[in-house]
């Protein structure tokens, strides 16, 4: 059957039993706050508050009176060395000094340098003087047989014999006598070249050669041993009072309060949740967390192994062209020329005059830049610069980890007792209990305060004794006891883990200079600095002793002395000769501080500092009940830096940093020692004339000057108004020297005066301008002949003229007369005569003509541009800025109460002795003697003794009481300042006075001669207003006002010596910076 669908809804069933209790509901919201409780009892008195901030400065008081001059102070110690001034501008280069004498030879270097290459051949020397005649050579071997001589002339015809028969031809006749010498034949051809002559004598030693170039830089010495550490510096003075501390951290949580009353019943909770379901499947992995902060930097790694050598550098630029090579060897001898006809040598001509020196050749092109010289040694360590100023305050660092637990401080003093609390309200009257039984006798109670007298009550009946009462309720809690003494310090806790490095603290104040640390190792060599400006010309060195003779050079060929050729192009630098190390020069003055390098990168945070000293003990608080341990609070702010620890040992040298960029100029170093005076600079251009200054005060009269040249006539001034006749003034001080009058007639010649004292030397005049170039000087006298040079090689055989024929041979003996026959035919030609002796050597031929100079070599390539020159000298300091404006005057302070009367002054010096008193009354008559009879017995000498005694008496009196009538003791002295000692005792009370020998006046100068400046004081002429005028107080405490005559511009002057001495001066207003007020006191002169 089809489904009929759900049936009708049944009746509601009965209520089931209650289900099991649900889970506890979530906590309800907090209840509303309860009503405020009653006011608690007043707490104990709080700790003493911090001192208030200092009050504003008070008003400026009046200027006090000037105190008496103190005794002269002891001379102060030498002041600290001043800071060096700015570098002066470099002076213009001085004139070239004359060449200094050669210095002494330096000590031999550790190693001899390599032998330099042979230098180019020197210029040919001049011809030496004629050498002495050498010894005669050994006799040569006999010459070969000469050729047959010419036939002699026919003999003289003999006397005619008697004619005989013609005989046969007779024998040859005897040899005829030698004929007379024939005419000299033409000169023969030159003979063959002779062999070399004998070795000449050893020549004298040549002059000592010049000193060689300095040797190469010696090898750097080993580092010295480490120096002892310096003594500790003195303990620094205590630092200034610290600033007020920051607010302390929040106190610990208080003890748990008492439990509150039970709250009202809450509303029923919402329906509980069911039991927890089973754990779900594992979820997918979450996103990767953020990267943690980087850990602290690790320790520095060990140095890496050295890298492999780099690739070879690029080929350097081509070196400069070498100097011309020496001349080649002479070419092979050419073919023999045709013999010329030999002329006779002419006589030797006189020497020509020396030619004028040629004009200076044009400057050659600049040579190529030489290679850089060897690096110099490291300079001496410069003086430590002054500490830099404090840096700007850094940003607040992150909070540091808490430091280690400090040791417990000493017990603080007991806190002040708290004020007594207010009295509590009286309680309600309790119900009377039944009378108790008699208790045991209690201890006597403390005496109560006496109550007011009550009225006398009626006597009651005696009550029955009551039973003991029950124990009463505990009384109310007493007031908190006073603070207990601080308990003993706990044991120090275990050392906590190292906290994270704290942030950078504020920069501490600059500490005192510590002792010098040990010298650090040599840093790596810096880049070469820029070339410094040329130094001043050094002083001439002492002449050095002659160096040892150099080795003999290879023997050159003797050339004739040629005229100097044109200067060739500069040769290339030769190799450096040996340079023995000279003695170490003194350290130069420290150079100007180099610019400071840039700030390096921030270093790693250092390890935590040592534990600071324990702080001062805080005031003891009231002991609270021990609370539960609260959760750890967040880290408090970093405490202030502890005091600076002792200086640690120097750490090992760090590796060299990279070369920093050029930093800003460092602070000026300490003043170096004075350099040697530089050469005189050229006169500067005159400056523009400054503005006219304010009129100065009249100066003291100067010493009498030399007679001035007469001035021109001044312009005629306008006539002034006639003033009323004033009273006759006291004698005025001597006026300034008037203009010289017209020249008077020639006076008589005075006596010859004593020679005056030497005047001080005048200041050196300005250096003159450089003179024009002088004419070339005439050629100097012939120098002394040089020492004979070594013997040259043997010259070629000279070609002498042919010697004259030798003398005729001796006549042969006359032969016997032949038989008188017919004359025979001529005999055959006789043999050639013996050769004559060798002729003397002919004169030397003239030197050949000077060859033409060779063509100029090609110009060298233009050198590369030189390095940038050093920075120019520091510019002059800018002008001083104008003075700032004056501040407004403060309000007038109230007048102070009059001071107590001062102590009596010191006893003044003894006054001058008074003039002699009038003669006294005549004394009583003495007993007389009649000496008339004795006069003839008195010797004449007695009268002389009396006269001498009397004159001595008057001189003594004049010494003791001088009357001031002495004339000039030293008329030859000149006017000027002298010291006078009035009582001729010790020199402490001597006076410095000006003696004017022309006016015969002695002038005492005021001390001090001038007083305050930059004050404004005037008397208004228009209104007669005297409020701002000067008040002067005299020695009798009388104030002198307004008794001056106005000169000009508010200045006043008085000429009344009765006002002296002046003890005080009271200007009433101070003017601006460009105004002056002062008081100049002129000298007081006595005649």
UniProtKB/Swiss-Prot annotation:
PROSITE patterns assigned to the protein according to its UniProt record, in alphabetical order: NC1_FIB
Record protein name field: Collagen alpha-2(I) chain
Organism: Epinephelus costae (Goldblotch grouper)
Compositionally biased spans, kind Pro residues: 189-199, 910-924
Region (Disordered) residue spans: 1-931
PANTHER family: COLLAGEN ALPHA-1(XXIII) CHAIN-LIKE ISOFORM X2, SI:CH211-266K2.1
Biased composition (Basic and acidic residues): 504-515, 829-843
Subcellular location: Secreted, Extracellular space, Extracellular matrix
Keyword Secreted: yes
GO terms assigned for molecular function: extracellular matrix structural constituent
Compositionally skewed regions (Gly residues) per UniProt: 218-227, 409-418, 466-493, 708-717, 792-812
Keywords: Collagen, Disulfide bond, Extracellular matrix, Secreted
Fibrillar collagen NC1 domain: residues covered: 929-1087
Any GO CC annotation of this UniProt entry: collagen trimer
Entry similarity comment: Belongs to the fibrillar collagen family.
Disulfide bond is among the record's keywords: yes
Low complexity bias: start-end ranges: 83-120, 150-159, 166-187, 201-211, 228-241, 278-321, 335-345, 360-384, 396-408, 443-453, 560-602, 613-640, 677-695, 718-740, 776-788, 813-828, 849-868, 897-909
Gene3D superfamilies registered for this protein in UniProt: 2.60.120.1000
């Amino acid at each position: 059957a089809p489904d009929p669908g759900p049936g009708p809804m049944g009746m509601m069933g009965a209520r089931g039993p209650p289900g099991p209790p649900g889970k506890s509901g979530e906590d309800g919201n907090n209840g509303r706050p309860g009503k405020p409780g009653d006011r608690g009892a007043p707490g104990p008195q709080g700790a003493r508050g911090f001192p208030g901030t200092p009050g504003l400065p008070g008003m400026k008081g009046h200027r006090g009176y000037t105190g008496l001059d103190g005794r002269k102070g002891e001379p102060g110690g030498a002041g600290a060395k001043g800071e060096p001034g700015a570098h002066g501008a470099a002076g213009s280069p001085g004139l070239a000094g004359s060449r200094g004498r050669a210095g002494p030879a330096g000590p031999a270097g550790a190693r001899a340098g390599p032998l330099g290459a042979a230098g180019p051949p020197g210029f040919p020397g001049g011809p030496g003087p004629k050498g002495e005649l050498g010894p005669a050579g050994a006799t040569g071997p006999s010459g070969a047989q000469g050729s047959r001589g010419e036939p002699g002339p026919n003999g003289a015809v003999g006397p005619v014999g008697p004619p005989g028969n013609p005989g046969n031809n007779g024998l040859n006749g005897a040899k005829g006598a030698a004929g007379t010498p024939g005419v000299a034949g033409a000169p023969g051809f030159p003979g063959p070249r002779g062999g070399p002559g004998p070795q000449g004598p050893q020549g004298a030693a040549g002059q000592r050669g010049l000193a060689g170039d300095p040797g190469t830089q010696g090898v750097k010495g080993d580092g010295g041993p480490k120096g002892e550490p310096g003594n500790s510096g003195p303990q620094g003075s205590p630092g200034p009072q610290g600033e007020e501390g920051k607010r302390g951290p929040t106190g610990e949580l208080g003890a748990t309060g008492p439990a509150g009353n039970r709250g009202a019943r809450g509303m029923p909770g919402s329906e509980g949740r069911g039991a927890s379901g089973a754990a779900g499947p594992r979820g997918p992995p979450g996103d990767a967390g953020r990267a943690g902060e980087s850990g602290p930097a690790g320790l520095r790694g060990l140095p890496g192994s050295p890298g492999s050598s780099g690739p070879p550098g690029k080929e350097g630029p081509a070196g400069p062209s070498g100097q011309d090579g020496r001349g080649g060897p002479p070419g092979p001898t050419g073919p023999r020329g045709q013999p010329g006809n030999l002329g006779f040598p002419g006589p030797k001509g006189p020497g020509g005059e020396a030619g004028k020196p040629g004009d200076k050749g044009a400057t050659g092109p600049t040579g190529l830049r030489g290679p850089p010289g060897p690096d110099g040694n490291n300079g001496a360590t410069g003086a430590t610069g002054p500490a830099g100023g404090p840096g700007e305050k850094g940003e607040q660092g992150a909070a540091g980890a808490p430091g280690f637990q400090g040791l417990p401080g000493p017990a603080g003093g007991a806190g002040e007792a708290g004020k007594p609390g207010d009295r509590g309200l009286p309680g309600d009257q309790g119900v009377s209990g039944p009378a108790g039984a008699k208790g045991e006798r209690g201890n006597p109670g403390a005496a109560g305060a006496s109550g007011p007298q009550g009225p006398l009550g009626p006597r009651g009946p005696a009550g029955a004794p009551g039973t003991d009462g029950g124990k009463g309720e505990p009384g109310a809690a007493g007031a908190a006891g006073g603070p207990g003494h601080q308990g003993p310090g706990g044991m120090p806790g275990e050392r906590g883990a190292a906290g994270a490095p704290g942030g950078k603290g504020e920069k501490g104040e600059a500490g005192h200079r510590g002792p010098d640390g040990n010298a650090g190792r040599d840093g790596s060599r810096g880049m070469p600095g820029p070339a410094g400006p040329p130094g001043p010309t050094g002083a001439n060195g002492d002449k050095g002793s002659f160096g040892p003779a150099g080795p003999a050079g290879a023997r050159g060929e003797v050339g004739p002395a040629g005229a100097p050729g044109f200067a060739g192009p500069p040769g290339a630098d030769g190799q450096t000769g040996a340079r023995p190390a000279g003695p170490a020069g003194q350290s130069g003055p420290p150079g100007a501080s180099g610019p400071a390098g840039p700030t390096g990168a921030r270093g790693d945070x250092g390890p935590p500092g040592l534990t600071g000293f324990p702080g001062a003990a805080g005031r003891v608080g009231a002991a609270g009940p021990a609370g539960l341990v609260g959760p750890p609070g967040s880290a408090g702010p970093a405490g202030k830096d502890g005091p600076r620890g002792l200086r640690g040992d120097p750490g090992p040298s760090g590796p060299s940093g990279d070369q920093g960029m050029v930093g800003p100029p460092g602070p000026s170093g300490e003043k170096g020692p004075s350099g040697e005076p530089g050469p005189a600079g050229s006169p500067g251009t005159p400056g523009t004339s400054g503005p006219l200054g304010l009129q100065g005060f009249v100066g003291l009269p100067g010493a009498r000057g030399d007679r001035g040249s007469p001035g021109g006539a001044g312009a005629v001034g306008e006539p002034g108004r006639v003033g009323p006749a004033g009273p006759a003034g006291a004698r005025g001080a001597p006026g300034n020297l008037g203009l010289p009058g017209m020249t008077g007639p020639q006076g008589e010649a005075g006596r010859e005066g004593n020679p005056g004292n030497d005047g001080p030397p005048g200041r050196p005049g300005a250096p003159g301008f450089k003179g024009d170039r002088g004419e070339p000087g005439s050629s100097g006298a012939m120098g002394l002949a040089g020492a004979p040079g070594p013997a040259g090689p043997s010259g070629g055989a000279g070609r002498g003229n042919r010697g004259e024929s030798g003398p005729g041979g001796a006549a042969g003996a006359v032969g016997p007369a032949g038989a008188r026959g017919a004359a025979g035919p001529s005999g055959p030609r006789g043999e050639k005569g013996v050769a004559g002796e060798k002729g003397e050597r002919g004169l030397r031929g003239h030197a050949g003509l000077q060859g033409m100079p060779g063509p100029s070599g090609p110009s060298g390539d233009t050198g590369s541009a030189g390095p940038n020159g050093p920075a120019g000298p520091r510019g002059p300091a800018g002008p001083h800025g104008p003075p700032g404006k004056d501040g407004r005057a403060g309000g007038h302070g109230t007048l102070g109460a009059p001071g107590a009367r001062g102590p009596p002054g010191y006893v003044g010096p003894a006054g001058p002795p008074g003039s002699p008193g009038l003669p006294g009354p005549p004394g009583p008559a003495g007993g007389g003697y009649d000496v008339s009879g004795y006069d003839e017995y008195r010797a004449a000498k007695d009268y002389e003794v009396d006269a001498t005694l009397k004159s001595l008496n008057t001189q003594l009196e004049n010494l003791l009481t001088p009357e001031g009538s002495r004339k000039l003791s030293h008329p030859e002295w000149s006017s000027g300042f002298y010291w006078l000692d009035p009582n001729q005792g010790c020199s402490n009370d001597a006076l410095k006075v000006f003696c004017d020998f022309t006016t015969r006046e002695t002038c005492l100068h005021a001390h001090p001669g001038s007083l305050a400046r930059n004050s404004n004081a005037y008397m208004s002429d228009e209104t007669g207003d005297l409020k701002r005028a000067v008040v002067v107080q005299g020695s009798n405490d009388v104030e002198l006002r307004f008794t001056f005559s106005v000169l000009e511009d508010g200045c006043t002057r008085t000429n009344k010596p009765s006002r002296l001495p002046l003890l005080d001066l009271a200007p009433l207003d101070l003017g601006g910076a460009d105004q002056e007020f002062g008081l100049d006191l002129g000298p007081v002169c006595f005649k």
